[in-house]
Every structure is written in structure tokens, then in C-alpha cells.
């Protein structure tokens, strides 16, 4: 009798093909959307979502030329350290000249620094601890002695 009940239950079951539920971007964790689409958001830029840019930063050091990739929201000194490049620094706050370099080509945003004056910035000096790349950039390092 048990076999009869089981066979009637199997016969009475209908198989309906279900379509997958649509996925909303809002249902994904923000980390997922960032990695999927190369997007980032943050309070530093008003909470807006912006496209992430990565630039090539070439360092001309006394030991030779070294190149790293650096996101536009990472200080060039931090990117160098992550790549194992040893560059000079002290305060890491843009308020001294230990990490000074000189931009040979390209551009950086160093609005976080408070040490260099407009004339020094105009001459191409940069504090690597407080500079974000805004394009591919080449920087001569170890320039603290050249700042007058």
C-alpha cells in the first residue's frame, strides 16, 4: 500500500520550469558591484560612484627606474611601498620635504599637502606621500636637497 501512495504522489507532481529571478544591482553588496564594474564610492568624493582609474607611475631613483600601477585614490608613495620600492619619507602627511620628488612628465593631485608653496609646485616638485596620480606620471625621487 505504501508503494501505491508513493507512485500516485510522483504521478501527481508537475514539473514547471522556473526562470531565474532577475538580479538587481541594489541586491548585490557594494563590494561586488565595485569589483564587477570597476566602480568605487566613498565619502571623500561626496559618496558618488565614479569610475576607477589606474595609472602607471615611473620612479627615477638613484638605483634606477622602477614602475608601478597606482589607482587614482592611492598616494604614489603607498603604491611604491606596496610594490617593494623603498623611497624616503618622514611625516606621511605632506607637511615636510623628506619624500620630495620632481614630476618629469604627467600630473598629480597633491592638494592634501601643506609644505610646498605655489612656486615649488610650479617648478614640478611633489610630495609623494600626499600625491595622487591624475595621469601616467614620471617622478624623479630623492629631491629634498633641491627644494630651496
Swiss-Prot record:
Positions bound to [2Fe-2S] cluster: 91, 96, 99, 129
2Fe-2S ferredoxin-type domain segment(s): 55-145
Pfam families in alphabetical order: Fer2
Transit peptide: first to last position: 1-52
InterPro entries xrefs: 2Fe-2S_ferredoxin-like_sf, 2Fe-2S_ferredoxin-type, 2Fe2S_fd_BS, Beta-grasp_dom_sf, Fd_pln
Family membership noted in the UniProt record: Belongs to the 2Fe2S plant-type ferredoxin family.
A molecular function GO annotation: 2 iron, 2 sulfur cluster binding
Cell location: Plastid, Chloroplast
Entry-linked PROSITE patterns: 2FE2S_FER_1 (PS00197), 2FE2S_FER_2 (PS51085)
Species: Arabidopsis thaliana
Tissues showing expression: Expressed in leaves. Not detected in roots.
Name of the protein in its database record: Ferredoxin-2, chloroplastic
Cofactor(s) annotated in UniProt: [2Fe-2S] cluster
Keywords per UniProt: 2Fe-2S, Chloroplast, Electron transport, Iron, Iron-sulfur, Metal-binding, Plastid, Transit peptide, Transport
Cited function: Ferredoxins are iron-sulfur proteins that transfer electrons in a wide variety of metabolic reactions.
Source taxonomy: Eukaryota, Viridiplantae, Streptophyta, Embryophyta, Tracheophyta
NCBIfam families: fdx_plant (TIGR02008)
Subunit description: Interacts with PGRL1A and PGRL1B.
Biological processes per GO annotation: photosynthetic acclimation; photosynthetic electron transport chain
Gene Ontology CC terms: chloroplast
Amino acid at each position: 500500500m505504501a508503494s501505491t501512495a508513493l507512485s500516485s504522489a510522483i504521478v501527481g507532481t508537475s514539473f514547471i520550469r522556473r526562470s531565474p529571478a532577475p538580479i538587481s544591482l541594489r541586491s548585490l553588496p557594494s563590494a561586488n558591484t565595485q569589483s564587477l564594474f570597476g566602480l568605487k564610492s566613498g565619502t571623500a568624493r561626496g559618496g558618488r560612484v565614479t569610475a576607477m582609474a589606474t595609472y602607471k607611475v615611473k620612479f627615477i631613483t638613484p638605483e634606477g627606474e622602477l614602475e608601478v600601477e597606482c589607482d587614482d585614490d592611492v598616494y604614489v608613495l603607498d603604491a611604491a611601498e606596496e610594490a617593494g620600492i623603498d623611497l624616503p619619507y618622514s611625516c606621511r602627511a605632506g607637511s615636510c620635504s623628506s619624500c620630495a620628488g620632481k614630476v618629469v612628465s604627467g600630473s598629480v593631485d597633491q592638494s592634501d599637502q601643506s609644505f610646498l608653496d605655489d612656486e615649488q609646485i610650479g617648478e614640478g616638485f611633489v610630495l609623494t606621500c600626499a600625491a595622487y596620480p591624475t595621469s601616467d606620471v614620471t617622478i624623479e625621487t630623492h629631491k629634498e636637497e633641491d627644494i630651496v
